[in-house]
Amino acid sequence: MAILVTGGAGYIGSHTCVELLNSGYEIVVLDNLSNSSAEALNRVKEITGKDLTFYEADLLDREAVDSVFAENEIEAVIHFAGLKAVGESVAIPLKYYHNNLTGTFILCEAMEKYGVKKIVFSSSATVYGVPETSPITEDFPLGATNPYGQTKLMLEQILRDLHTADNEWSVALLRYFNPFGAHPSGRIGEDPNGIPNNLMPYVAQVAVGKLEQLSVFGNDYPTKDGTGVRDYIHVVDLAEGHVKALEKVLNSTGADAYNLGTGTGYSVLEMVKAFEKVSGKEVPYRFADRRPGDIATCFADPAKAKRELGWEAKRGLEEMCADSWRWQSSNVNGYKSAE
């Protein structure tokens, strides 16, 4: 029996593949490589010394998805695949709705056809919209502020409805906060196409000299230094959370949401200073206007994941920065460095 990992060549997906292989699972990866590299999977095999099955295919291709299930004994699915840039989703909403929703429909229809009713879904803290306070618990009001977040919210509801209709379904909805860092080997890490959308890969690329300076959006928030506060979680902690969630769906039925965060918030400037300290490089920055929809403070209450999944984040800020710098400095052009 194997675990199907959609989007398994991506940033969080590739790190989760490492943890799955190291935990003894057989894995099948489906990825269209639209925002990832097959080199990541080569390195997953190198890190673990284990093999995996890879299909370069799109979830929108119903025949390709069907053949993955026909050719492999799939026991459960971890579903990462999807478009994920908030700003782009505002500019081209139809593309996001079509890709993220239709792809998941085709996946779930194949799962139903082949009797696979266990799924771990990659959701996001964006489903909380603009939370009034932090820390955020799973029962906070939901409401997305952009089409990307809206697709996550809609898919959460659709997966819950599957369980309501057929209680043999087992669904874990993982709401990530801000993934950061890289595998400690320095062999896999975050490799965004073009200019990064997220703070820390941008900081890393400034430190390594690929980008000139960082734009810090907003320095007038009601926080200790005026910059936004977020919950940054080491990507390996996040990957371990997926293995724990997989154990849960394999051994029980239900549909539950879990926050995967550290429960601690750091400001943009704290992150920049921590990265400068670890890398020994200066990260020049300038202040810019707030981005529409950004909020002052957002961090998780991860108590439910600890209680029900037996998971908690173990790696701190310094380790995140050190691992990120090791990856970025030894792979200046990401996976393209290997070509």
Swiss-Prot record:
Substrate binds at S124, A125, T126, Y176, F177, N178, N197, N198, L199, R230, R291, P292, G293, D294. Its cofactor is NAD(+). It catalyses: UDP-alpha-D-glucose = UDP-alpha-D-galactose; UDP-N-acetyl-alpha-D-glucosamine = UDP-N-acetyl-alpha-D-galactosamine. NAD(+) binds at G10, Y11, I12, D31, N32, L33, S34, N35, D58, L59, F80, K84, K152, Y176. Pathway: Cell wall biogenesis; teichoic acid biosynthesis. The keyword Phosphoprotein does not apply. Catalyzes two distinct but analogous reactions: the reversible epimerization of UDP-glucose to UDP-galactose and the reversible epimerization of UDP-N-acetylglucosamine to UDP-N-acetylgalactosamine. The enzyme is more efficient in catalyzing the interconversion between unacetylated than between corresponding N-acetylated substrates. Essential for growth in media containing either glucose or galactose. May protect the cell from the toxic effects of galactose and glucose or derivatives of both sugars. Involved in the biosynthesis of teichoic acids via the formation of UDP-N-acetylgalactosamine. Belongs to the NAD(P)-dependent epimerase/dehydratase family. It was initially assumed that galE and gneA were separate genes, coding for two different enzymes, but it was later shown that they are one and the same. This is UDP-glucose 4-epimerase. The lineage of its organism: Bacteria, Bacillati, Bacillota, Bacilli, Bacillales. The gene is galE.
